[in-house]
Amino acid sequence: MVHRPRANLQELAKAVGVSKATLYRFCPTREALIERLLDEATVTVGRAIANCNLEQAPVDTAFKALIAGFLESKELTQFLIFHFRPEFLNESNPDRRWLDIQKTCDDFFLRCQQEGMLRIDISAVALNEIFFGIATSLVESESRGRVPRAGMAELIERMFLQGAGA
């Protein structure tokens, strides 16, 4: 769905190695499939963030875990890059999962500042956006063959910390 965004259900079924009937039973429309994948991506990202223990782990350990968790599900990351909608972060949205994820990460970057890992002249919110901007850009570039997968975690860490490090 990322590399062939206009693919029909038949083409999508073939790409994942199932029959169209099987895919149709799972999700009868393309829109239903997108919504189901968005839900799965949201759950996966939330679980990855929770597993990093951003609230209590030492900040350097949690930061490395955040990068690793982000890279573990790069296919879903690519899907989210393509299908993420601004309303996911709207305060009036009844589904608060993305707002909770965003707040957890904002709070983590604030903690990194308070503990001297990150500079304080850039807001924690901006650091969160910069971090995920770097990470998503590199994942997307890797999918196009421009950046190798090997060493990606170290590259993200180095590029972020050298610009934002205290």
Question: Which positions does each model-derived feature cover?
Answer:
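Generic hydrophobic, amphipathic alpha-helix propensity
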Residues: 12, 37-41, 45, 105
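Helix-turn-helix
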Residues: 2-32, 36
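Short amphipathic alpha-helical interaction/hinge segments
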Residues: 74-82, 139-143, 164
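Amphipathic alpha-helical packing segments from all-alpha helical-bundle domains
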Residues: 43, 90-117, 124-133, 140
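Amphipathic alpha-helical interaction segments
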Residues: 11, 61-65, 69, 126-133, ...
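C-terminal peripheral helix-coil segments that are non-catalytic and often amphipathic
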Residues: 103-115, 140, 144-166
